[in-house]
A protein has these predicted regions:
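Alpha-helical membrane insertion/targeting regions
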Residues: 1-183
Length: 183
């Protein structure tokens, strides 16, 4: 049973959970709209460089996440914080670039067939499904770290780290598979 102080603190977190929910739902809704409903502007040359830039941001996020976890295991808190902020910034830049690209281009279909298409679709499906909780979990991890609620922060990050890392790495793999299929 929670102590009165813990219960009061939990109620104090309520505005964060509301904002986190709104931000998460809005970002997922925008992404779903761009990928599933909007057709794109039709100009295939505009922002054609963005998939490579986005893959670079994803790759950077993956490296920064691994370095950040190594830093905290070595009790290098300041380094961990800087690396996590950099990973968050890199993932944020990825998301902005991804949204901009798909706003212009709409959805990108994999042109291959056979086993490669099946492998691509399986990888893409796992990437998409696991990317859904990254934004709200990331916001929660940062929130509880800034509030110095490290027990809660650690519980969230034990789940978040492997998911965020997987999504970052598979984002690069999806790009490479599309790039090789389109030549």
């Amino acid at each position: 049973m929670a102590t009165p102080t813990a219960a009061a603190e939990d109620r104090g977190d309520r505005p964060f959970w509301i904002v986190n929910g709104v931000v998460s739902v809005l970002s997922l809704s925008l992404l779903a709209y761009l990928l599933l409903l909007r057709q794109g502007a039709g100009d295939k040359t505009s922002l054609a460089f963005m998939p490579a830039v986005n893959a670079t941001f994803n790759g950077a996020s993956a490296v920064l996440l691994v370095l950040a976890v190594a830093a905290i295991k070595e009790k290098k808190v300041a380094r961990h914080q800087k690396l996590m902020l950099a990973a968050f910034a890199s993932s944020t830049f990825f998301l902005v670039g991804y949204l901009a690209y798909h706003y212009v281009h709409g959805d990108t279909r994999y042109p291959g067939t056979g086993g490669m298409r099946i492998a691509y679709l399986a990888l893409l499906a796992s990437h998409v499904v696991l990317s859904i909780p990254v934004v709200p979990m990331c916001l929660a991890a940062f929130y509880f770290a800034f509030r110095r609620k490290f027990v809660t922060h650690k519980k969230i990050t034990k789940l978040l780290f492997p998911i965020w890392l997987y999504v970052s790495v598979t984002g690069v793999l999806v790009f490479l598979m599309l790039r090789s299929a389109y030549g």
